């Protein structure tokens, strides 16, 4: 599909399942092997050689960020600490997905004091009451242990995000989220639609209606406005369902990155997929390498897996379409993906104009790399694909503390394009205006 997505030569981010062990048995879990007690992979522990191979592959392919997941990463502490040390020494930024039920004071102290961990931990919170949480995890006492883990992280200054995976089993209790947030401090709230796992494809509990999806968006919008925390969803919201983009502008900024800028690595077996929910394997990091697998998943970047309802939609390049895994599993979809939907959008407040007297402070928390189309710039959580000329402009000012338009005129003629490029760098928070 022409123009569907940028064609990165390698991913900028990866999810790495560092173990197959998990102390929960969530009914929505995408890991098909976790119900197979005979699967010997559950018992395997990563070797130092495997850790070295993964680290070298990420460095060689210029991967910026790795999210450590599982299984439950806190169930393999020695491996977890080795990976944090190895990746950190190579400048790879880290995130972690954990249910936090195994978090202790000792672990939190080790993370912060020995490994200087200050990145967000995204924890799965399957229910907002003990009854529902324990029902979803199928483990008695899981809710109390998760909440205890959240509070321990707060005690040691570790930022926590919560991800609530929603099906019809726990949809009705979302209103309890407000009370939960009044008692427990978090930095991020995600509400994610459950995807029917491979072993339970036809379970109607996983198929949400259009009104239920809109209700999720309304809850997130209220959380952002009331508590001032960042909000989002692991699976994207189709714009033709939300319709009012202006109302939900804080949750529609991210479309699916699987196979476009991100992929998933099973560190135990080495298998590489585009998405953690996907059954297909595109390569193996130990035998054929990351680059080979990335090249093999071209169909994700070409838009070949986009569902038919989204392919001809004029908003596809902005929306990204429905989650590929949901679109591929919901044979009884309860909502209508409508390419002719009336999308309502009021642009963000305009940025102040730039003139020759305008000065900016330059962020030094920027990663960038060149690509055939230009390059990728990342500042904080903003990752943008830009032209070669913007890369050149950034390289000219990247080591400076403060710049003005006159600094840009050293390499560019004054033009509308230059001023627009400066504004783009400001939107990415690479430049911050000095008033």
Task: Locate the predicted segments by residue.
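Aromatic/hydrophobic pocket-lining residues that form the small-molecule binding cavity
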Residues: 47, 51, 80, 146, ...
């Amino acid at each position: 599909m022409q123009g569907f997505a940028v064609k990165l030569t390698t991913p900028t981010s990866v999810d790495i399942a560092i173990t197959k062990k998990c102390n929960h048995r969530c009914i929505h879990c995408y890991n098909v092997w976790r119900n197979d007690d005979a699967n010997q992979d559950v018992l395997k522990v990563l070797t130092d050689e495997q850790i070295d191979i993964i680290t070298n592959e990420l460095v060689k392919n210029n991967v910026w960020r790795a999210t450590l997941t599982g299984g439950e990463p806190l169930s393999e502490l020695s491996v977890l600490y080795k990976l944090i040390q190895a990746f950190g020494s190579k400048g790879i930024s880290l995130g972690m997905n954990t249910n936090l039920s195994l978090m202790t004071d000792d672990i939190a102290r080790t993370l912060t004091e020995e490994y200087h961990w200050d990145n967000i931990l995204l924890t799965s919170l399957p229910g907002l009451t003990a009854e529902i949480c324990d029902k979803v995890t199928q483990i008695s006492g899981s809710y109390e242990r998760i909440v205890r883990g959240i509070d321990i992280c707060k005690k040691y200054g570790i930022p926590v995000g919560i991800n609530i995976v929603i099906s019809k089993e726990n949809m009705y209790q979302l209103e309890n989220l407000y009370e939960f947030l009044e008692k427990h401090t978090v930095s991020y709230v995600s509400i994610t639609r459950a995807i029917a796992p491979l072993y339970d494809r036809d379970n109607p509990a996983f198929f949400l209606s259009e009104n239920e999806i809109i209700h999720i968006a309304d809850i997130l919008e209220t959380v952002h406005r009331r508590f001032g925390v960042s909000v989002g969803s692991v699976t994207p919201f189709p714009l033709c369902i939300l319709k009012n983009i202006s109302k939900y502008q804080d949750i529609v900024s991210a479309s699916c990155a699987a196979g476009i800028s991100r992929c998933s690595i099973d560190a135990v077996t080495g298998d590489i997929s585009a998405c953690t929910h996907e059954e297909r394997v595109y390569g193996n990091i130990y035998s054929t390498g990351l680059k080979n697998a990335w090249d093999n998943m071209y169909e994700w970047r070409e838009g070949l897996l986009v569902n038919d309802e989204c392919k001809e939609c004029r908003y596809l390049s902005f929306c990204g379409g429905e989650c590929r895994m949901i679109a591929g599993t919901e044979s009884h979809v309860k909502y209508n993906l409508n390419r002719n939907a009336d999308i309502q959008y009021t642009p963000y407040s305009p940025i102040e104009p730039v003139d020759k007297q305008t000065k900016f402070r330059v962020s030094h928390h920027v990663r960038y790399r060149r690509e055939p189309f230009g390059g990728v710039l990342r500042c904080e959580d903003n990752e943008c694909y830009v032209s070669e000329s913007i890369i050149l402009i950034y390289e000219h000012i990247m080591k400076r503390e403060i710049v003005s338009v006159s600094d840009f005129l050293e390499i560019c003629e004054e033009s509308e394009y230059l001023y627009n490029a400066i504004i783009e760098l400001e939107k990415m928070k690479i430049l911050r205006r000095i008033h």
